[in-house]
């Protein structure tokens, strides 16, 4: 049975994204107070869903969990999307996920057939409006017995 620490999954995703997609990476929710960099450069929020245990009786711990990366792109004048930041974040997220689907080894990896995306407009608790790009995928947890 998978007895996996959720924070380890957050750490796995954080380490993939920090400095590659953005320096502003948060777990679980939009922070209540945003930094100047958050409001000018944007930020991303990582969410980890429910872990589904798919272990078998052969001593292998195996599971899956749906995860979401939400990129918050600040608006420019008159509420328009900042195409440069949006494209940079979208491309960086897509590249990170693509690399992980090709790796397909280690304790965690991203399953290729489970990738979804969407976009929306959201407001932060500080009443800042953002365009959001959301990427959803399955992280596979593969722990071999020792």
Residue ranges and their predicted role:
Residues 63-75:
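Active-site-adjacent structural patch at catalytic or cofactor/ligand-binding sites
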Residues 33, 49-51, 72-76, 140-144:
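Generic structural motif
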Residues 1-59, 99-108:
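Small/polar-rich, solvent-exposed N-terminal microdomains that initiate assembly or binding
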Residues 85-93:
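Short amphipathic alpha-helices in soluble, non-transmembrane regions
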Residues 96:
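Extracellular and organelle-lumenal recognition/adhesion modules and their flexible linkers in secreted
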Residues 76-86:
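Short, conserved charged micro-motifs
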Residues 1-12, 51-64, 104-146:
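Short, charged interaction patches at domain edges and termini
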């Amino acid at each position: 049975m998978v007895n996996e620490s959720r924070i380890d999954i957050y750490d796995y995703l954080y380490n993939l994204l920090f400095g590659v997609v953005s320096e502003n990476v948060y777990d679980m929710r939009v922070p209540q107070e945003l930094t100047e960099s958050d409001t000018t450069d944007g930020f991303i929020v990582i969410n980890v869903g429910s872990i589904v245990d798919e272990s078998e009786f052969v001593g292998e711990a195996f599971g899956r969990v749906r995860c979401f990366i939400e990129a918050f792109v600040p608006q420019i004048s008159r509420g328009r999307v900042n195409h440069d930041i949006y494209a940079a974040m979208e491309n960086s997220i897509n590249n990170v996920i693509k690399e992980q689907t090709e790796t397909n080894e280690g304790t965690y990896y991203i399953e290729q057939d489970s990738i979804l995306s969407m976009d929306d407009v959201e407001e932060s608790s500080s009443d800042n409006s953002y365009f959001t790009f959301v990427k959803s995928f399955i992280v596979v947890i593969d722990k071999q017995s020792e």
